[in-house]
Amino acid sequence: MHKTPVLTLISVVIAFATTSPAFGAVISEPIPLWPKGAPNEKGDVGEEHDTTKPGDGLVSGQRVIRLGNVSKPEITLYRPSKEKDTGTAAVVCPGGGYSILAMDLEGTEICEWFNSIGVTGVLLKYRVPTRPGDDKHVLPLQDAQRALSLVRFHAKDWNLDPKRIGVLGFSAGAHLTASLSTTFDRRAYEPVDDADRVSCRPDFSMPIYPAYLALKDQDNKIAPDLNVTTNTPPTFLIQAEDDGVRVENSLVYYLALKNAKVPVEMHLYPNGGHGYGLRPSDKLISSWPKRAEEWLRGLGMLQTRNP
């Protein structure tokens, strides 16, 4: 194993950053995940682009960026202001059915919310759509494992606490969050450099309106790719009972975590549907970011560090 050029240059990339008007945040340049290209990637999905069409539905009166044909995965760091910075970071996994990525609704907007509570948001642009003949989840899991390890590997360089690095995701991204939280001891790819010697176990896990966790045709058994153990990280779950993706996804995961004695908090709301992110509405479910903040505070993730 050795330190590759991409690892050496990442700290330089962070130095070339822009300031966001929200909360005085600093946004890094995008950082490629893989020094020599992503594993198992053929690059034959077409040009990356926003697939949203004029007639596509709005969320809270706003359009959604639906990014498709991602073959070059990367992370972008959203840093909170120095006054708020807790040293905690969260990898953010947008949803989109493993077909597209809802990059603003379930990505940039979430990173900005994390900044407001002193957390660095690490926006993960993982590979979509599923390639013909490939398992739906393998390439995204490779990217998520690599992202978590890369952030932890650079924790000192980026002034982060290596013991406060978690993951949050929505819908398919919530499945990716749960997968990362239950397979961190088994790399989905051959290690490529020193970053892969670092654990990819999240310190906290936040699947929001998850998909693919329950097997509908098998009496809602938990999906076999999710190996919940006592080492699965503390987990926070949100879902609406009228979610068309089925609330059983949260229920079976909650029970598996509870039976494994993993700290878990779940909030179910009578209505809210699916795919709302944290955009405001008149529904009670719009209060979930406050519940999430309280949960993170209870874990000690929002304590400011001593100067």
Locate each region found by the language model.
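N-terminal cap/lid segment of alpha/beta-hydrolase-fold proteins
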Residues: 25-85
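Active-site glycine-rich loops that stabilize anionic/oxyanionic intermediates
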Residues: 94-99, 241
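Catalytic nucleophile-loop/oxyanion-hole region of alpha/beta-hydrolase
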Residues: 101-103, 109-110, 124-161, 279-285
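Conserved alpha/beta-hydrolase "acid-adjacent" motif
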Residues: 244-250
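Short beta-strand/loop motif that positions the catalytic acidic residue
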Residues: 237-239
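Short beta-strand element of the alpha/beta-hydrolase
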Residues: 86-95
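C-terminal catalytic histidine-bearing segment of alpha/beta-hydrolase fold enzymes
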Residues: 251-307
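Primarily recognizes the serine-hydrolase "nucleophile elbow" in alpha/beta-hydrolase
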Residues: 142-230
